[in-house]
């Protein structure tokens, strides 16, 4: 019996696009890109291929190309609600919030039952200072999809910011019911209990979490924060990485709702020092995050290096296109290994994850050249007497002004400290310290051990 011949056939264009979408969902982006390219060579006006090729470009950080492709797809198929919502996502990531809001509203006009568009609209309404409209948008998303975890989480965050803490806690409880091991919701619920003075309930959440995941850095750190027991001298690397990797995508949108001022306060302290762009300095942005501070100090820099522990944050910093290099490293190790490398070190809202500052300050002193400047922000431990530092229930450290002055002076630096409000949190201003310290020509050598 003769073996049967296998038969092959070429995929239709629709089948090819569906195959590319499957590759895209499986994170095989290069392979998907190759399929979209071939489809669009054969049919340049194929709406689905244009749209999903645009989404792929967005996934790969090419937002300009992404928007061009998505706009072409919508010109060909203007009544696609999903596509309008996706356009909003790309615009939002590009910082074009008003245009993104319009795109989400257009998606809802086409399909009033589009729960994700309602939720995404709520995020931007909150970010642009419209909490009443944001709440309505989140509740619309929940009404359409009673298991919409993101909408419940976002509504809880909004309500907490409006000091409606008990309502916020109810939202987080719902999220945990839907997804029992969702880290962010567990943390938010525990913080809500802390706000309500229910520290025992907060501790129970973290203790149960640790019983299930004994090595989880977030649960361990936050248990210490809400109980005051076994407080570490600084947040563990794992805590910082896990916190900011999960937070990176929404980081700037959230800060936009908090009147966040730390980078601007750092820049003002540089202007106060008389720095001018003509000086062309070698600058370290220590804990660069998504690059908010880097964008402000770039005019002073001949060379700007950003260092952070979070790959997610570094990816967003790369989009700012202001850094000469971005490095994933622990700050103390990096600065300590780069003697006399920088004229200026800035650190906005990063040293709040250090309690004991002696080691990191010693590393910064080594990394600074003579007459170099160190500028950073801290949260101010107001009303705690002459405390060195305190781990607060939200997981960040606050520091005493006297402690900071003594530490910098003993390190041979000349400090100037200004008190300022860093941002709003739960409806109240967060008191801060903006610190500038100059390294003299012959600074006192300091070791991390003191």
Label for each model-derived stretch:
Residues 17-25, 48-59, 82-93, 116-127, ...:
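Conserved alpha-helical positions within TPR/SEL1-like repeat arrays
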Residues 284, 288-334:
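Class I SAM-dependent methyltransferase SAM/SAH-binding core
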Residues 336-345:
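A short acidic, Gly/Pro-enriched loop at the edge of an enzyme's catalytic core
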Residues 358-370:
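A short glycine-rich, Lys/Arg-flanked "PGG" loop and its adjoining helix->strand segment in the class I
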Residues 376-396:
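Short, glycine-/aromatic-enriched active-site segment of Class I SAM-dependent methyltransferases
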């Amino acid at each position: 019996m003769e073996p049967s011949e296998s038969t092959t056939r070429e995929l239709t264009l629709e089948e090819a696009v569906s195959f590319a979408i499957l590759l895209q969902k499986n994170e095989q982006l290069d392979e998907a890109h190759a399929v979209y390219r071939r489809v669009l060579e054969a049919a340049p006006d194929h709406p689905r291929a244009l749209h999903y090729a645009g989404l792929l470009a967005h996934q790969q950080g090419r937002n300009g190309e992404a928007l061009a492709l998505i706009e072409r797809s919508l010109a060909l198929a203007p009544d696609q609600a999903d596509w309008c919502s996706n356009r909003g996502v790309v615009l939002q990531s590009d910082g074009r919030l008003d245009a993104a809001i319009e795109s989400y509203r257009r998606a809802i006009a086409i399909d009033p039952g589009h729960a994700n568009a309602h939720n995404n609209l709520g995020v931007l309404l909150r970010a642009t200072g419209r909490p009443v409209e944001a709440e309505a948008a989140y509740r619309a998303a929940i009404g359409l999809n009673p298991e919409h975890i993101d909408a419940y989480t976002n509504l809880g965050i909004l309500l907490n910011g409006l000091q409606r803490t008990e309502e916020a806690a109810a939202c987080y409880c719902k999220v945990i019911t839907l997804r029992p091991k969702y880290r962010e919701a567990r943390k938010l619920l525990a913080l809500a209990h802390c706000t309500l003075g229910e520290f025992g309930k907060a501790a129970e959440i973290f203790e149960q979490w640790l019983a299930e995941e004994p090595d989880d850095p977030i649960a361990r750190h936050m248990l210490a924060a809400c109980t005051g027991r076994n407080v570490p001298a600084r947040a563990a690397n794992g805590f910082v990485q896990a916190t900011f990797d999960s937070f990176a995508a929404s980081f700037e949108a959230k800060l936009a709702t908090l009147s966040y001022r730390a980078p601007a306060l750092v820049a003002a302290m540089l202007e106060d020092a008389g720095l001018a762009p003509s000086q062309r300095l070698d600058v370290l942005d220590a804990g660069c995050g998504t690059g908010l501070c880097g964008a402000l100090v770039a005019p002073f820099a001949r060379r700007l290096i950003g260092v952070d522990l979070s790959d997610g944050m570094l990816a967003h910093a790369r989009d700012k296109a202001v850094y000469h290099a971005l490095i994933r490293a622990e700050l103390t190790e990096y600065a300590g290994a780069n003697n006399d490398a920088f004229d200026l070190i800035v650190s906005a809202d990063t040293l709040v994850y250090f309690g004991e500052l002696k080691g990191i300050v010693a590393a910064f002193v080594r990394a600074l050249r003579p007459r170099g400047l160190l500028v950073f922000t801290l949260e101010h431990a107001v009303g705690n007497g002459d405390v060195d530092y305190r781990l607060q229930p939200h997981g960040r450290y606050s520091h005493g002004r006297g402690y900071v002055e003594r530490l910098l002076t003993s390190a041979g630096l000349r400090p100037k400290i200004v008190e300022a409000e860093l941002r709003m949190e739960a409806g109240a201003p967060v008191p801060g310290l903006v610190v500038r310290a100059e390294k003299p020509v012959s600074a006192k050598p300091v070791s991390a051990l003191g």
